[in-house]
Design a protein with these regions (language model features):
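Short amphipathic beta-strand/extended segments with alternating polar/hydrophobic composition
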Residues: 1, 120-121, 137
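Amphipathic alpha-helical segments typified by the pilin-like N-terminal helix
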Residues: 1-35
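Short beta-strand-to-coil "C-cap" segments at the C-terminal boundary of structured domains/repeats
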Residues: 3, 130-132
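A short acidic/small-residue loop/turn micro-motif
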Residues: 7, 134-137
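Extracellular/periplasmic head regions of type IV pilus-like filament subunits
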Residues: 26-116, 121-124, 131
């Protein structure tokens, strides 16, 4: 029986990749909940909008640590970009009319040399991966 062993740097890269995909899925889930329950079918146009508390006192849609459009976490740089803003009403958490978006994109780029995969997702909910930077969709 042969036992294969990952080099520590590759094992770390896999752990970072797994974390990055998890964060992207969390953003998709937060956006889906925000659009359905708070924003009348529109998406948050910033990560800060997802961390704002609704007027009813319930929790925000994302943890406050994700309150910037560019964050560094688990070996990745995450960049959030809103799509076009629409004729949106005010949201349940204080986003002003016309400030919510019709689409969004968030990409994850490895910060470290041992990171090999880039990830991205948008309002469609699919997480894409590539060996090079994924263009905003």
């Amino acid at each position: 029986m042969t036992v294969s062993r990952l080099e520590p740097s590759r094992a770390r890269a896999i752990a970072f990749e797994t974390s990055a995909v998890g964060i992207l899925r969390t953003v998709n889930s937060a956006q889906a909940t925000f659009t359905a329950s708070c924003a009348s079918g529109f998406y948050a146009s910033s990560m800060l909008d997802l961390t704002r508390l609704p007027a009813d006192g319930s929790d925000g849609y994302m943890s406050p640590e994700f309150n910037l459009n560019t964050i560094y976490k688990s070996g990745y740089r995450f960049r959030f970009r809103p799509g076009l803003r629409g004729a949106s009403p005010a949201t349940c958490n204080g986003v002003q009319p016309g400030r919510s978006a019709t689409t969004y994109y968030i990409g994850a780029e490895p910060e470290l040399a041992d990171g090999r995969r880039f990830f991205g997702t948008n309002q469609g909910g699919t997480v894409y991966q590539s060996s090079s930077r994924i263009q905003d969709t």
